[in-house]
Amino acid sequence: SFFGGKRFVPIATGFFCLVLAAIFGYVWPPVQHAIHAGGEWIVSAGALGSGIFGFINRLLIPTGLHQVLNTIAWFQIGEFTNAAGTVFHGDINRFYAGDGTAGMFMSGFFPIMMFGLPGAALAMYFAAPKERRPMVGGMLLSVAVTAFLTGVTEPLEFLFMFLAPLLYLLHALLTGISLFVATLLGIHAGFSFSAGAIDYALMYNLPAASQNVWMLLVMGVVFFAIYFVVFSLVIRMFNLKTPGREDKEDEIVTEEANSNTEEGLNQLATNYIAAVGGTDNLKAIDACITRLRLTVADS
């Protein structure tokens, strides 16, 4: 019938979405109110609130729910009226409008993203066995430079988030401490994208809002050392399987077959052909941008 088979899934999904929409229309407003109240409390708590914000912000990264918290702190909380009478809300908007009190939810991210996480990457590099360091060095260098320049940290964080959750918990805790200390020191800094070196340099064009931003570099050096020491000790103490420290028996392919050299790619192609029964079993070979399509005589 029309409603059966492959058509049933989208039809049923649409129906259940309508039901869930009606339910959440009543359920979500109290939840939203609770989230907003929590955000208001974090703002009113001063340095402690900014520290809690930084800690929760990192903890929510794996789920993507950190964006809910970011929206409240960066675009809703607080109010600033400029000389023209325009009202600005949120830490980011108030900072770039010249509010000298803004930045408590941004300043402490600079030492972590520009210095702390690159320190963690260096620790993971030296924690890997010497023979595997060339394999992981390029990867760790690229994500560390990305974090330093742009403040995009997810590629680096996801390298150890699931392999070593303890390290990620420590990372979240250190992030909270950084925001707490930055607020206590009276540092007011901001970013338009993220807390990387590019935004740090552009921030100097806003002297009305930027205050004590040079202290972020001092904090950065300290947090680089803290991350390097803490990650190095914890990785070795608990034998965490960070990049390059995986058990050899868990490796599915050889280093040669996993490389981008001509020899490695030839070996990988040979393994694929053998896995589908050899060249005599192949009737047709086709490919698109995402898949390799093989038609075989004996499946």
Give the role of each language-model region.
Residues 2-6, 13-17, 42, 46, ...:
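Alpha-helical transmembrane segments of multi-pass membrane proteins, especially transporters
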Residues 12, 125-127, 161, 285-287, ...:
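Generic beta-strand/beta-sheet core signal
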Residues 83-102, 118-121, 126, 142-143, ...:
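Transmembrane alpha-helical segments and their short flanking loops
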Residues 107-108, 129-134, 141-145, 190:
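Short, amphipathic, aromatic/basic-enriched membrane-interface segments that mark the entry/exit
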Residues 28-131:
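Helix-loop-helix hairpins and the membrane-proximal interhelical loops
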